[in-house]
Structures are given as C-alpha cells and as structure tokens.
Amino acid sequence: MEVTFFGTSAGLPTKERNTQSIALNLEPYSNSIWLFDVGEGTQHQILRHSIKLGKIDHIFITHMHGDHIFGLPGLLTSRSFQGGENKPLTIIGPKGIQNYIETSLQLSESHLNYPITYIEINQQLAYHHNGFTVQAEMLNHGIPSFGYRIEAPIMPGTINVEALRGIGLEPGPKYQEVKLQETFEYKGLIYNSDDFKGKAKPGPIISIFGDTKPCENEYELAKNSDLMIHEATYIEGDKKLANNYHHSHIDDVFNLIKQANVNKSLITHISNRYNIDEVTSIYNELSLDQTSPHFYFVKDFDTFKI
C-alpha cells in the first residue's frame, strides 16, 4: 500500500500547494484507489500523476468545508470519461454530501455514466469492504468533521516454494490455492496450507484525520496506527489561537503521536501563510528537538509506502 498527497495546504491553495486531497493505493490487496477529500483542483493534480480516475472506487470526505470538497463535481464528471464508465463509486461523508453533489450536477446539467452509492455519517461509522474495516468518529471542528481509521486485511504468509517442491508441487496456479485456503488437495492427499507458508502478518492500520482541535475520539482512531495523517494548520506560534479556530497546533499532534503509540506520522493541512522555505525551516528546527516524535511535513505529490 502507499499514500499520495495531491494537496497539502489549508483553507486556500498557494503557488506551491493545492487544497486537500489524499489518495490511498490498496495494492497488493486490490488495484483500487481510495480518495480522502477532494479540494479544488484535485483532478488537475491527478493529471500529473499515474493514478487514473477509473481506479477510484471510494471517496471519503472528512467535512464540508470548501478546501475539502470544491473539487468533487469536476472530478466526478471527468471520471465518466476517464475509465469510470459503469464502474460503481461509493462516497462516504457527513450529512449533506449527497445533496451538495446532486445539486451541483443538476444545476450544471452534468450526467454521470456510473452509479454512486452515498453513505452519510451521523456520529460514527463502521464500514467493511473486501476485508478492509473503516471506522469513522466525530472530531471537534465546529462543524461535523470526521477522522477515519482504516485496518487492512491480514496478509497471508509467504509461500515456501522448497517445501512444496518437496511434495512434488512445482510453481503454478495451485500455489494461489495454498496461499489463500486453509487446506489444499494434491495427488489425492489433503495438506494443511500453513505447513507450506510463513506466518500471516496483520495488515497495516492507517488513521486519516479531518480538521480538528484535540478531542477524545482522536486517540481511539490513532492508537497503534502504523501511519497517521493529521492536520497541523499551525506549525508554530500560539497553541490557544489554533484551538480557538478548531484546528490543531503541531504540539497537539506531537502529544497525540506519543499517547496513541503511532509508528509514523505525516503532517498536512499546513496554513497557506507559510511558503515552502518557511515550512522546511520550521521542520528542521523541530527535528533537532530530541523530544520530537517521528514526523514529516508533507508536500504535494509526496508518496509514501505503508
């Protein structure tokens, strides 16, 4: 799996950073892409990447502020002509997301050639799809804003080729049966698949947060995450000011990383008041502090393996 950032700015785009959008590539579990938020200009950012709109089969919206949704109507209509024909799409988000999309399409007389399933969240959500579990919880942003916890399926153990050759089974289609099933039959005998592969590995846990100031639900979403993606609109200055505007200060994020035992954290939604050089300078300063946890300030088009 890997995650790509198509927008890392907060509120407004800058010359260097677009508004919010994150793509989660589900390979090797599937060839699908899940998109989290679709700020203005997202489809233009995607044109500069190898991701195809037709591979996006889920869109998760954290909240209804414009820097997270203004790119939706254009992206949805373009998907009709870029590999999305007859490919179902699921859109999950706060109440109002369906009305926003359908009103935009109706008033612009836009017509899609694929079906959309809408799931609107009230307070929380437990969603299951192809072995993935997605948990959504309400955050604290002044309007309904959600964080998402994605738990990937268990990865089957690696095939022990030499052990299978030991019973006369050479590499071929049968190996997929060994990998995915508890038992397999070969030459009239039934074998336990676990005897011919390594231990299964738990899938990674990824937590992706919408805009928020510190709140209790953050911990539940972030705990023991292999990767956490969190906003830090304010990467310096007065923490009270950040919280007054229902946003997080970098110190808030650091506290969450430590309390929730997060392995790796990527910081996005950095205020548009900072240019790239200023972001880099503040990052370098924070990195020198021995008490800082493992973190990184992301830039547009950054991609990270999970």
Curated annotation (Swiss-Prot):
InterPro entries xrefs: Metallo-B-lactamas, RibonucZ/Hydroxyglut_hydro, RNase_Z/BN
Complexes and interactors: Homodimer.
Cofactor note text: Binds 2 Zn(2+) ions.
The organism of origin for this protein: Staphylococcus epidermidis (strain ATCC 12228 / FDA PCI 1200)
Biological function: Zinc phosphodiesterase, which displays some tRNA 3'-processing endonuclease activity. Probably involved in tRNA maturation, by removing a 3'-trailer from precursor tRNA.
Gene3D superfamilies associated with the record: Ribonuclease Z/Hydroxyacylglutathione hydrolase-like
Keywords: Endonuclease, Hydrolase, Metal-binding, Nuclease, tRNA processing, Zinc
Keyword presence, Cell inner membrane: no
Catalytic activity as recorded in UniProt: Endonucleolytic cleavage of RNA, removing extra 3' nucleotides from tRNA precursor, generating 3' termini of tRNAs. A 3'-hydroxy group is left at the tRNA terminus and a 5'-phosphoryl group is left at the trailer molecule
Pfam families registered for this protein in UniProt: Lactamase_B_2 (PF12706)
Positions with a binding annotation for Zn(2+) 1: 63, 65, 141, 211
Annotated protein name in UniProt: Ribonuclease Z
CDD domains, per database record: RNaseZ_ZiPD-like_MBL-fold
Binding site for Zn(2+) 2: 67-68, 211, 269
Enzyme Commission number(s) of this protein: 3.1.26.11
Gene for this chain: rnz
Active site: residue positions: 67
Family: Belongs to the RNase Z family.
Xref: PANTHER family: ZINC PHOSPHODIESTERASE ELAC PROTEIN 1
Cofactor(s) for this UniProt protein: Zn(2+)
